[in-house]
């Protein structure tokens, strides 16, 4: 059979690798900055653009989509060409994908510090950027599927299965979660409200972790680990079971992020059951990876690439065991809203994604530059300092999470909360926040070492932009018999269709009843839409990222109802576009804060948090007192919310600003009575109006004092 000559495109891989390293360092630096702000609030430099609430999503987006995302594309473009024995389908699409993705990252880097955010975790970017993401993701998909169709290898290797699942599922997740109604060029409201929005968001949020941070890297593991170890994958059959069970089960597990919330109990239970089931396929993948090293463990001692990959696969196993354990209600009751979750996320992010990326880069660079790694010794140092960084980061966070949760729940002998002041539970863990920053700095130092090592490696070699290869053409002939999955691997269109069906089942079964059966979200007659002033205040709350530190969900625990008041009901959130339940309590829950403190207290708290809450790690927000709300946007906001079902009367937008000014004047007069002067158009007035509204639509029980 005649061999065909062709060339692999290494240049596109190089571009994605350069972006990976640069954005990795930037994302880690932003992470160190926000970690520092938790024990040194002044580290925001007094600027509104560098506060924790605004740059925490910048850190998560930089790490997930810029660092891990670019690394994923580098690994996919490198391995796919070699596994399919063909160049990528279209060079034009490859480079359109690269530059489009970098422009999206640049847009995120500009808009998030400006406070242009939807507030939804891992989906904070506003609607024009969402559209750009959709277009570029389709470009990636066309290029990938086109490459599969023009392949010279009949069977699709296991790594390709995971790449297909990644493309299909992320596309579905992004489209469903990004339904929003635009107000301006950079302001929109989620199409969904309250409980429904929470379910869709965490269906997306959980599976973004599953299908952006997990499945593509399992594909990368299945390619690069056998290459680095010079051993075949341990079990083909195990990889089949691993793949199909993982993608089917994973999609159901999102509700475990919403245990003890206002989400219907049946949905919470589904999330718990499928999360526990996830242990089996996840550990199947981990064991398949580790057992691939059989006969090569002696090399792990000397080879830094294998070291990184072994720890990465082990971290994957630990994270995918801990995740299901955290979905058990009794465990979740302790861990949720605490730094335990931060530790869990970072063991996966730093250990699984980070270390696998490092191992991949150390393996690829010497081969694309036709040389050897500049310094194996320096790579080994990187491994040990990175491992130490993970330990120094994670252990204090696990400790902080358990300590703070137990303090929240502790009652004294008289039956009262032992620590009614939330700040008492914060000051105890501030030293652990400092240790967290040290751990992050160690990990970052290792990444700097790697960057130096890779640059020196490239300089001592010569880049091979187009790597020559040859393979026979794929014959068009009918093959009968064989293992059923072997037959499926020869039919990429059918394979992709089955993946789509597998991932849609769970989402449809969880979401459709929540949207269609009204009893899932009982209505409460006293719950009314936000006033125009409160609506502006809510948007300021979103802009400042307050939901990054404060929850708005009182769970049905005695410790929480004693501290905050009546537990939260599903019907209270029917006009919340988007929901703002939060996932972390660096500060207290705010769902029942309305009418708890007077207006002067809120005014002083935002101007100088320590004046009202000694020991607070919250920074001041002086710009709220000088910046004014834009009343020109009021009508557009009212119309947009009416479009998504909020019952504002037809034509109300024409008189909404009159109500806004009247309510603002009431607050200004009240502040003046407390010897505080402020303009009625100041942003702080709108924010106070919103905070005073929270939780007041239903009767609030007495709460702990001095919160």
Please state what every model-predicted region is:
Residues 499, 504, 548, 562-683:
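Electron-transfer interface patches adjacent to heme c in soluble/periplasmic c-type cytochromes
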Residues 334-335, 409-434, 482, 654, ...:
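Short, membrane-exposed interhelical loops at transmembrane-helix boundaries
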Residues 46-58, 63, 198-199, 481-488, ...:
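Sequence context of c-type cytochrome heme-c attachment sites
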Residues 537, 543-552, 602, 687, ...:
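The canonical Cys-X-X-Cys-His
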Residues 460-470, 474-530, 651, 658-665, ...:
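Post-cleavage N-terminal segment of exported redox proteins
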Residues 518-542, 556-557, 586, 672-679, ...:
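Electrostatic cytochrome c docking/interface patches
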Residues 2-15, 297, 477-488:
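Cytosolic juxtamembrane amphipathic/interface segments immediately preceding
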Residues 14-45, 49-116, 127-148, 160-185, ...:
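Hydrophobic cores of alpha-helical transmembrane segments in multi-pass integral membrane proteins
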């Amino acid at each position: 059979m005649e061999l065909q000559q062709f060339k692999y495109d290494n240049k596109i891989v190089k571009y994605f690798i350069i972006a990976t390293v640069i954005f990795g360092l930037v994302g880690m630096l932003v992470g160190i900055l926000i970690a520092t702000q938790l024990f040194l609030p002044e580290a925001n430099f007094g600027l509104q653009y560098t506060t924790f609430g605004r740059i925490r999503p910048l850190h998560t987006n930089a790490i997930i989509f810029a660092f891990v995302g670019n690394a994923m594309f580098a690994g996919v473009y490198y391995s796919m060409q070699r596994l399919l024995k063909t160049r990528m389908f279209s060079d034009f699409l490859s480079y359109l994908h690269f530059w489009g993705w970098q422009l999206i990252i640049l847009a995120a880097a500009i808009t998030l510090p400006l406070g242009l955010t939807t507030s939804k975790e891992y989906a904070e970017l506003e609607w024009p950027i969402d559209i750009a993401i959709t277009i570029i993701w389709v470009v990636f998909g066309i290029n990938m599927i086109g490459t599969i169709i023009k392949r010279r290898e009949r069977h699709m290797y296991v790594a390709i299965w995971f790449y297909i699942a990644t493309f299909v599922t992320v596309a579905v997740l992004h489209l469903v979660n990004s339904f929003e109604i635009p107000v301006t060029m950079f302001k929109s409201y989620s199409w969904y409200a309250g409980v429904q929005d929470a379910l869709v968001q965490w269906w997306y949020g959980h599976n973004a972790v599953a299908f952006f941070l997990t499945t593509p890297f399992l594909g990368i593991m299945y390619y690069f680990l056998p290459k680095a170890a010079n051993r075949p994958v341990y079990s083909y059959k195990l990889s089949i079971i691993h793949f199909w069970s993982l993608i089917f089960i994973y999609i159901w597990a999102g509700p475990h992020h919403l245990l003890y919330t206002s989400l219907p109990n049946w949905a919470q239970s589904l999330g718990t059951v499928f999360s526990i089931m996830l242990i089996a396929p996840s550990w199947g993948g981990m064991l398949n990876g580790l057992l691939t090293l059989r006969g090569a463990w002696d090399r792990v001692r000397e080879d830094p690439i294998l070291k990184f990959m072994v720890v990465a696969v082990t971290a994957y196993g630990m994270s995918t065991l801990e995740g299901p354990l955290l979905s058990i209600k009794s465990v979740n009751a302790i861990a949720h809203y605490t730094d335990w979750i931060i530790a869990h996320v970072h063991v996966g992010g730093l250990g699984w994604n980070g270390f696998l990326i490092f191992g991949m880069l150390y393996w690829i660079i010497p081969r694309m530059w036709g040389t050897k790694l500049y310094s194996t010794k320096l790579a080994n140092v990187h491994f040990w300092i990175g491992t130490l960084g993970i330990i120094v980061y994670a252990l204090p966070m696990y400790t902080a999470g358990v300590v703070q949760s137990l303090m929240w729940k502790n009652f004294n002998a008289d039956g009262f909360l032992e620590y009614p002041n939330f700040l008492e539970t914060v000051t105890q863990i501030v030293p652990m926040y400092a240790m967290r920053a040290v751990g992050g700095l160690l990990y970052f130092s290792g990444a700097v070492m790697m960057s130096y090592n890779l640059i020196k490696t490239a300089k001592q070699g010569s880049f091979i932009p187009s790597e020559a290869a040859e393979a026979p053409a794929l014959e068009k002939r009918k093959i009968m018999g064989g293992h059923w999955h072997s037959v499926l691997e020869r039919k990429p269109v059918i394979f992709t269709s089955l993946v789509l069906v597998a991932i849609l089942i769970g989402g449809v079964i969880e979401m459709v009843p929540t949207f269609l059966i009204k009893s899932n979200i009982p209505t409460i007659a006293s719950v009314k839409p936000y006033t125009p002033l409160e609506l502006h205040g809510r948007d300021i709350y979103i802009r400042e990222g307050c939901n990054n530190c404060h929850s708005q969900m009182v769970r049905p625990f005695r410790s929480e109802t004693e501290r905050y008041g009546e537990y939260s009901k599903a019907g209270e959130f029917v006009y919340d576009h988007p929901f703002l339940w939060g996932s972390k309590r660096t500060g207290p829950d705010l769902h029942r804060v309305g009418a708890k403190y007077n207006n002067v207290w809120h005014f002083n708290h935002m101007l100088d948090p320590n004046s009202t809450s000694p020991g607070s790690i919250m920074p001041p927000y002086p710009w709220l007192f000088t910046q004014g709300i834009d009343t020109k946007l009021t009508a557009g906001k009212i119309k947009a919310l009416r479009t998504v079902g909020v019952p504002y009367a037809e034509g109300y937008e024409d008189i909404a600003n009159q109500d806004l000014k009247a309510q603002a004047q009431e607050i200004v007069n009240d502040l003046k009575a407390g010897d505080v002067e402020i303009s009625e158009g100041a942003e702080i007035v709108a924010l106070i109006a919103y905070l005073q509204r929270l939780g007041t639509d239903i009767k609030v029980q007495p709460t702990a004092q001095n919160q």
